[in-house]
Amino acid sequence: MAFVEQEELIAIRRQLHQIPEIGLEEKETQAFLLNEIDKMKQPYLQVRTWQTGILVFIEGKNPQKTIGWRADIDGLPIQEEVVSAFQSKRPGFMHACGHDFHMTIGLGVLKELSQQQPDNNFLFLFQPAEENEAGGMLMYEDHAFGEWLPDEFYALHVNPDLPVGTISTRVGTLFAATCEVNITLKGKGGHAAFPHQANDMVLAATNLIQQAQTIVSRNVDPVVGAVVTFGTFHAGTACNVIAEEATLSGTIRTLTAETNEQTQRRIREISEGIAQSFQCEVTVHLDQKGYLPVVNEPACTTNFIEYMSKQATVQFQQAPVAMTGEDFGYLLSKVPGTMFWLGVASPYSLHSAKFEPNEEALLFGVEAVSGFLKSLDN
């Protein structure tokens, strides 16, 4: 018997969509979730909070293990361009990565599983700060899970390129490890007519960007792969003034932790070499936080794939590796488990101001996930 209806899920998702909040500031989101969870009161259901995160524990009748489900809750600093009756009420902020879907499905699955006391324990994690602060790592390092730490952990991420009704994953690495790169070069400014009296940081920075691309082409095993992308470059104040300072920011994406460490090391070496070559100062800040590769544990994932492949309502696809970053990789480095894609058929990509996932995926997601988690309780 299903306890969740599509209309209920759509209403919840639309309310959440209107109140996006960035990492560790999700106070209204947390209050909304706690109110919904309070409606599910059961003597075997316990709730804890950690900053803006929520942990819900369903105590089993005869627990042999604890099974975890994670949904991230933060939004993005993006001005929404989708015009609707439920568009974001917060200027400059949007649920452009589908975390409103993740929360709604998480609530739906929690409602389904909490109707009757299961045999095993279940932990539902509504996790803050996936996008900016690696909230999963922060919670783990702060011992937020305590005795509720799962023996297996599962999570999904919406995928705009897959049709509704599709689930996709793979054994092993699914998503990349990421690392933020911030570099500042400082030389000597001057008049454009007298370059010999100055030390041009535009020239130094462009050389650094070009040399950084040799990491991928000449240092990293081509079979393993990596991406080094600089997304911002700021220098100078006028067309006839040689820039004294240049700042760069970018990202490293790799499919293994080892390659990420190698790439970080080469970024530092190249930056120091540029500083010596151009006789300038350089500051390099590399911040990986908890964005480790998402590695799906073989036994958990094989079981998940076998289950989903047998469901008549599910179109299962083998997923290719993606350079997407996800802090669930940190939790999977501590607890075995699986992450997977859920198709939501949006014409626009994740992090797009026009991202508009199909709400028909909500009930499908609740039914598919609930069925799978219940199968683990047998």
Curated annotation (Swiss-Prot):
Record CDD domains: M20_Acy1_YkuR-like
GO biological process, one term: lysine biosynthetic process via diaminopimelate
Catalytic center residues: D72, E131 (proton acceptor)
Keyword Protein biosynthesis appears in the UniProt entry: no
Pfam families: M20_dimer (PF07687), Peptidase_M20 (PF01546)
EC number, as in UniProt: 3.5.1.47
Catalytic activity field: N-acetyl-(2S,6S)-2,6-diaminopimelate + H2O = (2S,6S)-2,6-diaminopimelate + acetate
Pathway involvement of the protein, from the record: Amino-acid biosynthesis; L-lysine biosynthesis via DAP pathway; LL-2,6-diaminopimelate from (S)-tetrahydrodipicolinate (acetylase route): step 3/3
Coiled coil ranges: none
Keywords per UniProt: Amino-acid biosynthesis, Diaminopimelate biosynthesis, Hydrolase, Lysine biosynthesis
Xref: SUPFAM superfamilies: Bacterial exopeptidase dimerisation domain, Zn-dependent exopeptidases
Enzyme class: hydrolase
Molecular-function annotations in GO: N-acetyldiaminopimelate deacetylase activity
InterPro entries on file: AcetylDAP_deacetylase (IPR023905), Amidohydrolase (IPR017439), Bact_exopeptidase_dim_dom (IPR036264), Peptidase_M20 (IPR002933), Peptidase_M20_dimer (IPR011650)
Protein function: Catalyzes the conversion of N-acetyl-diaminopimelate to diaminopimelate and acetate.
Family in the record: Belongs to the peptidase M20A family. N-acetyldiaminopimelate deacetylase subfamily.
Record protein name field: N-acetyldiaminopimelate deacetylase
The species this protein was found in: Enterococcus faecalis (strain ATCC 700802 / V583)
